[in-house]
Amino acid sequence: ATHFAEEASREQYDAVVVFGGDGTVNEVISGIAERDYIPKLGIIPGGTGNLITKLLEINQDIDGAIDELDFNLTNKIDIGKANDNYFGYIFSIGSLPEAIHNVEIEDKTKFGILAYAVNTMKSVMTDQVFNIKVETENGNYVGEASHVLVLLTNYFADKKIFEENKDGYANIL
């Protein structure tokens, strides 16, 4: 998906439409983020959780999302960067990313988003601690943490945890 998005940017396509989940959307964002020309991005939800499309209030029905695609009505969204990877919703440190990455396709198909919750709960039980340094405009933190979540929204999963967050800043948990 990243290479396709890079090519679309290089060839100056008007738009890129991605069908997939949050991981696929992040791959496309990584492919167009720092380009001289950035095509418009349309997203058709095709993953398990589809949190990015839910946060953007995109119709969760595939046919409905396709019918509602309108590249004359666009919004800018915040994106984040960690090392060389971009993200459109969340970046995390700790056992959470591995737990999410290691969910088996069969489990996602059978249990849906619950498969992520089960793996996440298993991972939280490990007491692995990381030395971290977080620098913000409001102060710095140097110390240990088992998990760090950087959110570009006011939601975590489907739970609202902050007031509106369209300010260009990330929330750190």
Task: Explain the meaning of each model-derived region.
Residues A1-V16, N26, S30-G31, R35:
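ATP/NTP phosphate-donor binding region
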Residues D22:
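Polar, low-complexity loop segments and adjacent catalytic/binding residues used for recognizing
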Residues N26, I52, A157-D158:
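Glycine/Thr-rich phosphate-binding loops of Rossmann-like dinucleotide-binding domains
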Residues I29-I32, K54-L56, I161-F162:
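Short amphipathic alpha-helical segments
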Residues E34-V150:
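Catalytic core of DAGKc-family lipid kinases
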Residues E137, E144-L173:
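Internal anion-binding site segments
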